[in-house]
């Protein structure tokens, strides 16, 4: 009869230990992922002491600057998607809308980061829940950097724990959800009422009547004065472009009033023709507190934008006619590798070509 040696017994014991360790590791992994799902839905479940609620229950009282309704399209698959908040106000609006649209398209639950909530919730009635920091730290994220136009691949993403990155702001991601996006970016009542109060004070110079047509004008200046010519071989909107855009509206609407906002209000006052008495410099230009200027633009009937996501979102939410600055870079600009005009501007918007002669003179023969 064969009797196992001490060596055989030791090897058998080690094999049993290895198999047991693998078994318990798999059990722990399942519990960990289940715990993350529970943590994402129930932040007060003795796991996280986050002050930010991250699951919306119907009928639960909310802060005036928080969401006022539950997500309208719950996810059909497990897992969590989020997006890294980067850039300023308009950038984060684009990131929010893209996250919402792609998560719905792929049947996942979208959560926003607390930093994005802090930027957008004081202005809009957003409904996406906020991700608990504990989940963000421990979740097995896969990252995906988005380019700024919709691709077929983005409709078939399989990762359950996905963190999107980049600066998406193309209507091709979310335009099929336009009414939902407009609902997400509904201004809080006090901002809307304040903006309407400002507009209601304006009078037509010749008759003293209240205007019936307001055209919001956003003039992007600031860091773009340096970035566009030096990095992207591009220009920002100049006085001639703004004059053309305003004349376009004057030819189509009776007595329109132009409500100018900008992060360069001093330049606007010096370079926009006010001789007709139909231009009002209403913006305060406070980049750190954009809510007031944005609310003014959204409450207008139509929009003139130059470049940038702030102007895009003002036009998208205001509706009506939109004039935008077209062909604002040289054909050789590397900006065109990451920016597709046909994916940036709605087909019904009207473009007026930029004057590139200052760049061409700098480039030489």
UniProtKB/Swiss-Prot annotation:
<keyword id="KW-0443">Lipid metabolism</keyword>
<dbReference type="GO" id="GO:0010595">
    <property type="term" value="P:positive regulation of endothelial cell migration"/>
</dbReference>
<keyword id="KW-0472">Membrane</keyword>
<comment type="similarity">
    <text>Belongs to the glycosyltransferase 11 family.</text>
</comment>
<feature type="topological domain" description="Lumenal">
    <location>
        <begin position="29"/>
        <end position="365"/>
    </location>
</feature>
<keyword id="KW-0328">Glycosyltransferase</keyword>
<keyword id="KW-0333">Golgi apparatus</keyword>
<dbReference type="GO" id="GO:0006629">
    <property type="term" value="P:lipid metabolic process"/>
</dbReference>
<feature type="glycosylation site" description="N-linked (GlcNAc...) asparagine">
    <location>
        <position position="65"/>
    </location>
</feature>
<feature type="topological domain" description="Cytoplasmic">
    <location>
        <begin position="1"/>
        <end position="8"/>
    </location>
</feature>
<dbReference type="GO" id="GO:0031127">
    <property type="term" value="F:alpha-(1,2)-fucosyltransferase activity"/>
</dbReference>
<feature type="transmembrane region" description="Helical; Signal-anchor for type II membrane protein">
    <location>
        <begin position="9"/>
        <end position="28"/>
    </location>
</feature>
<dbReference type="GO" id="GO:0021772">
    <property type="term" value="P:olfactory bulb development"/>
</dbReference>
<protein>
    <recommendedName>
        <fullName>Galactoside alpha-(1,2)-fucosyltransferase 1</fullName>
        <ecNumber>2.4.1.69</ecNumber>
        <ecNumber>2.4.1.344</ecNumber>
    </recommendedName>
</protein>
<feature type="glycosylation site" description="N-linked (GlcNAc...) asparagine">
    <location>
        <position position="301"/>
    </location>
</feature>
<dbReference type="GO" id="GO:0036065">
    <property type="term" value="P:fucosylation"/>
</dbReference>
<dbReference type="GO" id="GO:0008107">
    <property type="term" value="F:galactoside 2-alpha-L-fucosyltransferase activity"/>
</dbReference>
<dbReference type="GO" id="GO:0032580">
    <property type="term" value="C:Golgi cisterna membrane"/>
</dbReference>
<comment type="pathway">
    <text>Protein modification; protein glycosylation.</text>
</comment>
<feature type="glycosylation site" description="N-linked (GlcNAc...) asparagine">
    <location>
        <position position="327"/>
    </location>
</feature>
<keyword id="KW-1133">Transmembrane helix</keyword>
<keyword id="KW-0808">Transferase</keyword>
<dbReference type="GO" id="GO:0030155">
    <property type="term" value="P:regulation of cell adhesion"/>
</dbReference>
<dbReference type="GO" id="GO:1904906">
    <property type="term" value="P:positive regulation of endothelial cell-matrix adhesion via fibronectin"/>
</dbReference>
<keyword id="KW-0812">Transmembrane</keyword>
<dbReference type="GO" id="GO:1903672">
    <property type="term" value="P:positive regulation of sprouting angiogenesis"/>
</dbReference>
<dbReference type="GO" id="GO:0001954">
    <property type="term" value="P:positive regulation of cell-matrix adhesion"/>
</dbReference>
<keyword id="KW-0325">Glycoprotein</keyword>
<keyword id="KW-0735">Signal-anchor</keyword>
<dbReference type="GO" id="GO:0006486">
    <property type="term" value="P:protein glycosylation"/>
</dbReference>
<dbReference type="GO" id="GO:0005975">
    <property type="term" value="P:carbohydrate metabolic process"/>
</dbReference>
<dbReference type="GO" id="GO:0001936">
    <property type="term" value="P:regulation of endothelial cell proliferation"/>
</dbReference>
<dbReference type="Pfam" id="PF01531">
    <property type="entry name" value="Glyco_transf_11"/>
</dbReference>
<comment type="function">
    <text>Catalyzes the transfer of L-fucose, from a guanosine diphosphate-beta-L-fucose, to the terminal galactose residue of glycoconjugates through an alpha(1,2) linkage leading to H antigen synthesis that is an intermediate substrate in the synthesis of ABO blood group antigens. H antigen is essential for maturation of the glomerular layer of the main olfactory bulb, in cell migration and early cell-cell contacts during tumor associated angiogenesis. Preferentially fucosylates soluble lactose and to a lesser extent fucosylates glycolipids gangliosides GA1 and GM1a.</text>
</comment>
<dbReference type="InterPro" id="IPR002516">
    <property type="entry name" value="Glyco_trans_11"/>
</dbReference>
